[in-house]
Amino acid sequence: MISAISSPWLTQLSHFCDVAAFTANSLSSLNATGGYHLSPSPGDPYSQHEPHYEPCSASQHSYSFGHACPEPESGASSSSCASSTPGSGSTGSSSSNKAPVKKNPKVANINVQLEMKALWDEFNQLGTEMIVTKAGRRMFPTFQVKIFGMDPMADYMLLMDFVPVDDKRYRYAFHSSSWLVAGKADPATPGRVHYHPDSPAKGAQWMKQIVSFDKLKLTNNLLDDNGHIILNSMHRYQPRFHVVYVDPRKDSEKYAEENFKTFVFEETRFTAVTAYQNHRITQLKIASNPFAKGFRDCDPEDWPRNHRPGSLPLMNAFARSRNPVSSPTQNGSDKDGDGRREYERDASGTPLHGDAAHQQLMSRVLSLSLPVPGGLVPLSTGRPSPPHELRLDPHSQGSEPLHHHPYKYPTSYDRYLGAKTRPAPYPLPTIRGHGYHHHHMNPAAANMYSGAGAPGSYEYGPR
């Protein structure tokens, strides 16, 4: 069990405190009679749904540590079931059947204050849930404390462990938004201790800053080899915070019982889950977790409405900025908006519609009555055809100089207009025969279609 604890100070700590006995005895006493019967916190949502749970105060049942971790003598600050906060003054005392051991002065006067207590209380009122994953998940709220009363020049180690609140397994009833007892607890997981990465350190260093266990991770992987805390899902747990004095004496093993002090904050108890069960817990975690900013961009009630494509800001802006392509008669009017003026400019910023060549081209493309001998000839009588259905007449193809071409890449544009369309899968009744201008000998005119003239207007023989 202790071999799973990865800490460079484990060997050193074994000379000052019997960690094996400390962990094994504290966890094995859970199944014993009169073990860890924690009193329910005020407003605890679990207490009213536990028909077989017999709450008892911390003063009636102590946190038994066996031979390694006895209780302090009466009158001293409790080292096991005490939420010792200087501001609140809530210090619990407990009694033991065996004679209490006097604590070392290095730890006897230590008090601990829980940070973010108001947030912990808010979660506790709803029934705190902590996610456990195979890879390990950090706690939120993070367990953070402020320590007082240490010897500034003494060395201390800080560690945490987690003990089951009871011997029950729970399930969440969504219809009543409450937790119910689902049966007896699963077999106990391997007991582990999490050492603060800065341990050991001088008391002055611990007291000058808030101590945060933000590296602690919870997992449900029984074969975890990363040193994470292993918990059973749908079980309730109580975190415990331990301060261990690093005794420099050679025979420090004899004083292991008096060189540590334990603090328990009942508002930090939680249920281990693989997914949040209470939606209020989910909302509170999103609202209070600084790393959940992405979930706070919009109200959860508005998510379906805000994620419709038509309601996206980009789509709205695009719809407002769209302007239909105007006819050539409107290009010079004063009603042109900014969007149209941007459309009428090429990459160099030169207005295109002001060019005579561009106006001539657009008039041929968009006019309803295109002349047959002109440059562009429609496929059939009716509305103008798209550009890919148009063909260049040989009379107008070479009449326009290259440097006056309205488009930036005239060669590519001419090939685009002169590209052959795919053959129609059915006959087109409106298409007449095609004529071939023999005297020009221009291949560009070989496939020119005309709907205005009859085949007789073109002669296949020389004149």
From Swiss-Prot:
Residues 75-96 have a biased composition (Low complexity). Probable transcriptional regulator involved in developmental processes. Binds to the palindromic T site 5'-TTCACACCTAGGTGTGAA-3' DNA sequence. Induces pre-placodal ectoderm (PPE) gene expression in regions where RIPPLY3 is absent. Plays a role in the formation of the anteroposterior (AP) axis during embryonic development; required to establish the posterolateral border of the pre-placodal ectoderm (PPE) acting downstream of the retinoic acid receptor (RAR) signaling. One of its GO terms (cellular component) is chromatin. PROSITE patterns: TBOX_1, TBOX_2, TBOX_3. Binds DNA as a dimer. Interacts with dscr6/ripply3. It comes from the Eukaryota. GO terms for biological process: cell fate specification; cellular response to retinoic acid; ectodermal placode formation; positive regulation of transcription by RNA polymerase II; regulation of developmental process; regulation of transcription by RNA polymerase II. Keywords: Activator, Developmental protein, DNA-binding, Nucleus, Transcription, Transcription regulation. Residues 39-58, 75-104, 320-354, 377-409 are annotated as: Disordered. This is T-box transcription factor TBX1-A. A motif (Nuclear localization signal) lies at residues 420-431. It is found in: Nucleus. It holds the Pfam family T-box.
